[in-house]
């Protein structure tokens, strides 16, 4: 179980609701969100830039990157794609 943490401005660093974990930037915008089961990141996770713009989408299995990961540039275009297996990169495409 994650301990409750706050930024100095009182904004929560993260919040749990069921098995969903949401991390926040100090400005209150969402930094990352996904499933957190048995103290591990699982399934699809979405990461954002501090502006709120989509940055990365990827999957975890047992707290390790697994499957496709897609990173977006600041113009919302795919910057590159990677495929992971048990935390190790097995393929990268630009």
Describe every region a protein language model picked out:
Residues 1-94:
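Glycine/tyrosine- and acidic-biased, solvent-exposed loop/turn segments at the edges of beta-strands
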């Amino acid at each position: 179980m994650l301990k409750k943490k706050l930024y100095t401005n009182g904004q929560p660093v993260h919040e749990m609701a069921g098995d969903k974990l949401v991390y926040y930037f100090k400005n209150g915008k969402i930094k990352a969100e996904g499933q957190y089961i048995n103290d591990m990141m699982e399934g699809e996770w979405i990461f954002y830039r501090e502006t709120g713009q989509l940055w990365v989408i990827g999957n975890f299995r047992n707290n390790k990157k697994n499957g496709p990961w897609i990173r977006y540039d600041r113009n919302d275009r795919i910057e590159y794609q990677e495929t992971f297996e048990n935390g190790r990169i097995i393929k990268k495409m630009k």
